[in-house]
Amino acid sequence: MKTFGKKVVLIGDGSVGSSYAFAMVTQGVADEFVIIDIAKDKVKADVQDLNHGTVHSPSPVDVKAGEYEDCKDADLVVITAGAPQKPGETRLQLVEKNTKIMKSIVKSVMDSGFDGYFLIAANPVDILTRFVKEYTGLPAERVIGSGTVLDSARLQYLISQELGVAPSSVDASIIGEHGDTELAVWSQANVAGISVYDTLKEQTGSEAKAEEIYVNTRDAAYEIIQAKGSTYYGIALALMRISKAILNNENNVLNVSIQLDGQYGGHKGVYLGVPTLVNQHGAVKIYEMPLSAEEQALFDKSVKTLEDTFDSIKYLLED
C-alpha cells in the first residue's frame, strides 16, 4: 500500500454525507476532504460553505469537489450514497436497490486505482459492507461498516439518562445487525463495574425498564425518520469517530461491522457489528464478549437473518 496519510473521499452528499463532512471539518480529522455526488451544484455549495468555516477548524483542511479519479490516492473512502429509508421501511427492505447503487460506486472507485480503506454507512450496512468486501476482494480489515457504533451510543445515552451519569461513563454494547435483530449485551453492561441491568431492576422493581431501553434503542431510527425524514447527526458523528480512529491510529475498540472468522459461535463470512480494534491498519482484531445463552441465541438469529438476506443479492456479485 501507499504511504498512509489523511486524505478522505466522501461519496454521497445528502443529509448523512454533509453532516459527516461538517463533523470532520470541525474536528480537524482530515488534511484533504473530497466530496463526490451526482448533485454537483449541491457539492459545490457545500464545499464553499465548509471552506468558509475552516478558519475555525483545529487544524488545516482543504475541502474540495471531486470525481472518482480523486480516489486513486485516498486513504479512506466513505460511502453514504444510497436510496434513503422511507417511513415504515426496514433497512433490509432497501437491500436490492442499494446494492446495485453500491456496486456502481465501488466499481468506479476501484477503477481509479484506489488502495485504501472503505468505510460504509449506506443501509443495510452489514449487507452492503460484505458486498463491497466480496466484490473488491480486499482484505476484510480494509472494508469496514458503521455497524452498531450508533446503536451502542443510543443505548449508552438512554442508560445514562436513567442512571444520572455521563453517557461516556456507561460501558454498554449493541451487537449484531444494525437493524431489527440487533441485541443489547446486558450481561456485560456496567457503570464502574456495576451491572446496569441489576441496577435498573433494583431501581424499578422489574426487568421492564431494560427492555424498554432496548426497544427505544432499536426503534430510534423509525421514530426519527417518521418525524423528520431521516437520521443524520448521530450516524455522522459515529462515522467521524471511526474515521478518527483509523486516520489517527487510535487503537480504539468500536462496534464496527466487520467479517467474522469463527468468532461468536463459529460464524464465518458474515459482516455485523461487534467490538473491534480500529487503527491505521483498519479493523484489525475482533473482541469476543462473553454472552449469556439467551444472548448467543439472539446473536445466532441475527447472523441467520443477515446470511439469508445476503444470499438474495449474491447474484449481483457477477459482472
UniProtKB/Swiss-Prot annotation:
Pathway: Fermentation; pyruvate fermentation to lactate; (S)-lactate from pyruvate: step 1/1. It is found in: Cytoplasm. The active site is at H178. GO terms for biological process: glycolytic process; lactate metabolic process; pyruvate metabolic process. Its EC number is 1.1.1.27. NAD(+) binds at V16, D37, K42, Y68, G82, A83, S104, A121, A122, N123, S146. Transmembrane segments: none annotated. CDD domains: HicDH_like (cd05291). Catalyzes the conversion of lactate to pyruvate (Potential). Contributes to S.aureus growth during nitrosative stress in both aerobically and anaerobically cultured cells, despite playing a secondary role in this resistance mechanism. HAMAP family: Lactate_dehydrog. Belongs to the LDH/MDH superfamily. LDH family. This is L-lactate dehydrogenase 2. It comes from Staphylococcus aureus (strain NCTC 8325 / PS 47). The gene is ldh2.
